[in-house]
Design a protein with these regions (language model features):
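C-terminal regulatory/interaction module of P-loop NTP-utilizing enzymes
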Residues: 1-143
Length: 143
């Protein structure tokens, strides 16, 4: 039996890659064949800052994490600064976890010292009154 597609039917699929399989950031992915890729249009969705503001209402966390994310993108250093990651920083800050512990376990994890220095050097629209920014600068000096 053939079932006709409803005129309003749409399929939306999401992926962390462009269909070419594993890379350095997403190692557990498989490539899709050309016929499958041909059936879909690629639409890039960036992180939604308004959603992040609603979920994690801390100007200090958001300003730091957005500046850090922007610097990562600007420098093309392969490092993910996701909404989920911002949430982890926010929740740990709310629980009173020390800033340096948050930075080490959730922000600069898996980055080399050179990459951290490069990212920090490219952060903008933030100043040392932000406890995360001053903390990361101190962390760099101790690493």
């Amino acid at each position: 039996e053939t079932i006709d597609r409803h005129p309003d039917f749409r399929i939306i699929a999401a992926a962390n890659t462009w269909g070419k399989g594993a890379d350095l950031q997403y190692v557990g992915r498989n490539a899709l064949d050309a016929a499958t890729l041909d059936r879909f249009d690629n639409i890039f969705f960036d992180y939604d800052r308004k959603l992040e503001e609603c979920l994690y209402p801390s100007e200090e966390v958001l300003k730091f994490m957005w500046s850090f994310r922007d610097a990562v993108l600007k420098t093309k250093i392969p490092h993910v600064v996701s909404t989920r990651g911002i949430g982890k920083v926010y929740k740990k800050d709310q629980r009173g976890i020390p800033v340096n512990d948050i930075l080490t376990s959730n922000v600069v994890k898996n980055l080399s010292q050179d990459d951290v220095n490069t990212v920090i050097g490219n952060m903008s629209d933030i100043n040392s009154s932000n406890k995360f920014y001053s903390g990361i600068k101190q962390l760099v000096l101790r690493r």
